[in-house]
């Protein structure tokens, strides 16, 4: 049996916030003078939102630096270097056809137990990172078949050990529902069927809210968790402008509905809201006051690595006076990524 080489995508995460620390295009030449001042503890054991900033319990400002644990709980074909077999259900079908369903179940169990281990979390912490983003599929919290199981407790088993590793090595954790009921993107990344049915299906929307409430009930008192990222990259760009606009108009309402469900059991954690069209379009949002612990999140994979290229995102952050979190960058040259990392923080 040939071994399968696993490719982990380590995507830099940086939080860009604060009036004088905002996506400054310094190119590494201009330095920001930082004043020494006494810290005032927040009185909370959780990271909190204060204007455009995140504040640690000790009163210090938190600048997120870290990585995604992509492909672990949401397998994506391109991370295996597959061309057309590009999501979990396709990979599962391929393995089952080649080696049988029993082997497929064994494969997925071995994959989950070995793809990310405590040693990986220790290494991430050693690099100077302070945060990990954990993408996951909603099916880990249902009886639907997924990665060789149909056990609604599997998601908690995987999250529990990740939380303990993060606690041990001093890392924050963001829970990212990368694959939502019905599919929220309409592309392979949501493990769906080519259309964001979440925006058409009441049953999918209710399940989406119910799962987030279940997760929040479990982790409401867990300070390792920085926040809940409700969905990843909703509404892709391959649909018509009219259809995109129709679904964009529903996005904020679904976010509000899920937030209300979470707040029934958890008032401690931050809610992260991604823009539509690859987490890049924030025009659908009109009400950023519906909760007092909100943070928006964006992604960047192309264009110039300059401040001008992300000025619309900066302007939205400044208008809302809320933090903006760069959740993913990558798929570019090393030089582009190095230049963009200089653009974001100061």
Question: Where are the regions a protein language model picked out?
Answer:
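Bacterial Sec-dependent N-terminal signal peptides
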Residues: 1-31
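Extracellular glycoside hydrolase catalytic/binding regions
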Residues: 43-47, 102, 200, 206-227, ...
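An active-site-proximal structural segment forming one wall of the substrate-binding cleft
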Residues: 47, 103-132, 142, 146-179, ...
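Feature marks short, surface-exposed loop/turn motifs that line or immediately flank catalytic pockets
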Residues: 71-73, 138-142, 181, 234, ...
